[in-house]
Amino acid sequence: MTIDLHCDLLGCVEQEPKLHFEHPDTNCSIPQLLQGGVRLQTLAVAAITCPGSTGVTQRQVALYQKLLKEYPSVAPYSAYHPTSEKLHCIFAIENASGLLEEGEPFEEALKRFEAYQAVEKILYVSLTWNQENRFGGGNASAVGLKRDGELFLEYLEGKGVAIDLSHTSDALAHDILNYIDKKGLHLIPIASHSNFRSIKDIPRNLPNTLAQEIIKRGGMIGINFVRRFVGEGPQDFLDHIHHGLALGGEDALCLGSDFYGGIDIPFSLLPERSLPVFQEDYSNASCYPRFLELLRSVFPERVVQKISYENAYKHITANISL
């Protein structure tokens, strides 16, 4: 059994007319997820910061409702049970610009958040994507936390929704942690789809200080399968996991594949050297049995099971009520 913290199936289908929920070019199609043994998949509702971002989110939420209606093999998180053979899904908001455009009153974000929570549980929210927005700085910037970001963190207090640091600048991530402490907020930081900067030095990966803060605060770190974030071969996956364990992350490491395919964003923003996006043997969601065998060749079964599903399951069930 596998639990995955991040894929872009909804964004693939929303942005590319030729794709659908069973299309293999998504790299996270329903058949691929089921073949990979995924029993709980976090579906990112993702938007870039631009005019119309809230409409993108609205369309992706509608696609999720269509998915549940048309595919009997897929069920909502509210129906999740570890013994079920169905694929269960939960939401995440990747970039709060999908809840609020740059010129709108702040209160509109809260209305939209509550409306989407009524459709499906939201596991986590990222304030930003790559760029700066009204909430703070994304991973391609050096901007920290802004006032609207502070207000949104306060709003999330006690709602059982994690705050995702995978697409923050380092400054924003540190500001978020400091603001949580300053206000005494019950808000758990995670990195849903990031690896370790000590192994692969790119901004989307975690520096040791942030990784250790996430671990210390009971959060999750989802291992990302994008080649540019991992490295060129299987050994690079193992190196990231070894590093995470050395930082004390045995109970924090999870899977956060970031599988997607065939869409203009983020492909159009990637440098040419980023292609192919994934390693050949680990290029779509059906690869999980093979990936877990790779882990078993090095790590004890206890660690493999924690990474595969136990850590994510414990976090989700402890922080989100059915």
Residue spans for each PLM region:
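Short acidic/histidine-rich active-site segments
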Residues: F225, G248-L270
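An N-terminally biased module of ancient metal coordination in phosphate/nucleic-acid-related enzymes
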Residues: M1-L43, R273
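Histidine/acidic residue-rich metal-binding segments in metalloenzymes
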Residues: E107-V119, L123, N139-A162, T168-I190, ...
